[in-house]
């Protein structure tokens, strides 16, 4: 067992424009090299474009896109008797949110590499795709679900 103390969770201050902790976490995921102002411009610009395209408020688009991408199940490796099994487990709320934020960011980054568009446009497109239950981030979630479903037979090896 570890002799260290359990790490304290950092308190994240809400973002300045929408006063949302989830959006502040998303800005932290997008941020590179401590450039918060650039990350805020990208996220706020993408949200305003999404708001203009759909006609709903930016926060409702963001929260529903996030809820559509958040996974409920994932697989974890468990070694039993010299054999490694992929055991499906439920995902805790905090991990589910952080996975969804990372997947949306990663899907927008890969779209940015494939096209000649700005990152803000790719992020807007990815948020709208996640809102409509399509796109790269939603595809990653569905792959995780398929893995969990395929390994359902090993669910009795749950972690304690």
From Swiss-Prot:
Known function: One of the primary rRNA binding proteins, it binds directly to 16S rRNA where it nucleates assembly of the head domain of the 30S subunit. Is located at the subunit interface close to the decoding center, probably blocks exit of the E-site tRNA.
GO biological-process terms attached to the record: translation
S-S pairs: none
Quaternary structure and partners: Part of the 30S ribosomal subunit. Contacts proteins S9 and S11.
Keywords from the named record: Ribonucleoprotein, Ribosomal protein, RNA-binding, rRNA-binding, tRNA-binding
CC per GO annotation: small ribosomal subunit
Natural source organism: Ehrlichia ruminantium (strain Gardel)
GO MF terms, alphabetically ordered: rRNA binding; structural constituent of ribosome; tRNA binding
Family label: Belongs to the universal ribosomal protein uS7 family.
Protein name, as recorded: Small ribosomal subunit protein uS7
